[in-house]
């Protein structure tokens, strides 16, 4: 029997169950939602179990309360297949005592018109939402955790050794991704998981998510385009233009929008929103989201790249390393009840990531694969942005950090900026 690797989301789920009657865990397929929920659940129904699926569909329409019978917390896996159950849960939570009754997991949102008609209430006040992602390096035991974001925000952060990874090893981790199944394997078997994942998306899932038939060939071409545009604020028209050289027929922007929208509904794409701070100057802030997959291995698999391919193309590696860091930062932020955004203004000043908490504390983060010149560029950007922030109306940044791929330990520059290998971070 496989040993369960503790997830950062274990504590997030427990806290949510203490606060609400039901918790919805959303996230990409294979990221570990069901397994994590099973650690806490006292009973479970697998809606898509082939032996029970037909019966579950009928029961959801005729007597949805029957599907709720069982010890609490009760896990309802792939709940979006029977959206009628949503209102049944809301009603039960309203008319019973106690929190932490239900856990719902799903790899897609029920977004077609028929499913929407089956959900009459939003769930506000009864449900808590958790967005789960593939494993961070700390969860897959590939980060020492010597630098804690919680400590940095508390003003007591200490710097320590990193779990050392060579650039070649980081290329492997980027291609392998944080899929729990992949972290239990090694070599080719581990790398294959992302390729199988992308195959499933383009051949079945992207059409199944909203019952719209989509072309597998165009699906993979759009995913390749998104992979080439990771870490950019590319518009739908820019994606269309990227497709043009390899497209036998013109692709309409509405078609691109539909395909990208389907990928978002499956949590395959998770764009990063813009951060809009109060600035001393009046430079307009860009509000376009930054394009990211939920895991860097989706990009490498879509492009047909392995670790050697990344090492032969360090520019692409740099962009996809940024996707890996974005994945980890989002999980570390979630553990601190925070979020991650990006900053870019009309003058070209940008910051790859801003981790911000609900109480107004925030940290500025640049991502660089490594090298003195790139680190110097990151220092310049961070210091310039910090100097532009109006500290009369906002707090000063709790920290400034550059995340790099390699390094034996984290250290502090003379200006106070932290240089941290990705292999030393934790929540």
What are these regions (language model features)?
Residues 1-14:
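N-terminal pre-Walker A segment at the start of P-loop NTPase domains
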Residues 25:
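Hydrophobic anchor at the beta1->P-loop junction of P-loop NTPases
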Residues 33-34:
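Conserved lysine of the Walker
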Residues 45-73:
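Short glycine-rich substrate-engagement loop in P-loop NTPases that contacts/grips substrate
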Residues 86-110:
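Conserved catalytic/switch belt of AAA+ P-loop NTPases
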Residues 112-232:
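Interdomain motor-coupling "hinge/lid" segment immediately C-terminal to the ATP-binding subdomain
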Residues 187-361:
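Accessory nucleic acid-recognition modules appended to NTPase machines
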Residues 405-427:
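Domain-level recognition of nuclease-like catalytic cores that cleave nucleotide substrates
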């Amino acid at each position: 029997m496989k040993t369960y690797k503790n997830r950062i989301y274990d504590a997030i789920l427990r806290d949510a169950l203490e606060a609400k009657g039901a918790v919805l865990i959303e996230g990409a397929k294979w990221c570990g939602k069901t397994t994590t929920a099973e650690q806490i659940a006292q009973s479970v129904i697998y809606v898509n179990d082939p032996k029970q699926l037909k019966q579950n569909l009928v029961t959801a329409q005729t007597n949805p309360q029957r599907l709720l019978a069982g010890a609490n917390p009760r896990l309802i896996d792939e709940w979006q297949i029977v959206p009628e159950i949503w209102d049944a849960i809301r009603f039960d939570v309203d008319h019973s005592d106690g929190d932490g009754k239900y856990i719902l997991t799903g790899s897609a949102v029920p977004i077609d018109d028929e499913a929407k008609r089956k959900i009459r209430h939003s769930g506000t006040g009864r449900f808590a939402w958790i967005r789960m992602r593939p494993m961070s390096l700390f969860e897959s035991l590939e980060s020492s955790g010597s630098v804690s974001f919680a400590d940095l925000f508390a003003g007591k952060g200490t710097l320590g050794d990193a779990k050392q990874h060579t650039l070649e090893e980081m290329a492997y981790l980027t291609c392998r991704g944080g899929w729990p199944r992949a972290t239990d394997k090694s070599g080719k078997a581990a790398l294959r998981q992302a390729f199988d994942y992308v195959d499933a998306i383009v051949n079945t899932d992207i059409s199944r998510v909203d019952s719209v038939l989509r072309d597998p060939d165009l699906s993979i071409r759009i995913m390749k385009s998104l992979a080439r545009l990771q870490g950019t604020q590319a518009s739908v028209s820019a994606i269309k233009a990227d497709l043009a050289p390899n497209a036998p027929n013109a692709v309409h922007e509405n078609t691109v929008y539909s395909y990208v929208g389907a990928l978002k509904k499956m949590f395959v794409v998770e764009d990063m929103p813009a951060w809009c701070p109060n600035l001393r100057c009046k430079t307009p802030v860009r509000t376009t989201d930054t394009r990211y997959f939920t895991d860097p291995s989706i990009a490498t698999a879509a492009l047909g790249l392995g670790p050697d391919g990344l090492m032969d193309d360090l520019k692409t590696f740099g962009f996809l390393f940024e996707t890996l860091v974005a994945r980890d930062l989002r999980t570390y932020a979630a553990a601190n009840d925070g979020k991650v955004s990006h900053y870019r203004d009309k003058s070209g000043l940008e910051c790859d990531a801003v981790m911000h908490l609900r109480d107004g504390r925030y940290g500025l983060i640049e991502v660089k694969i490594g090298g003195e010149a790139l680190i110097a560029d990151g220092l310049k950007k961070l210091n310039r942005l910090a100097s532009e922030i109006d500290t009369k109306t906002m707090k000063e940044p709790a920290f400034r950090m550059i995340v790099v791929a390699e390094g034996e330990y984290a250290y502090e520059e003379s200006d106070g900026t932290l240089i941290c290998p990705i292999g030393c971070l934790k929540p």
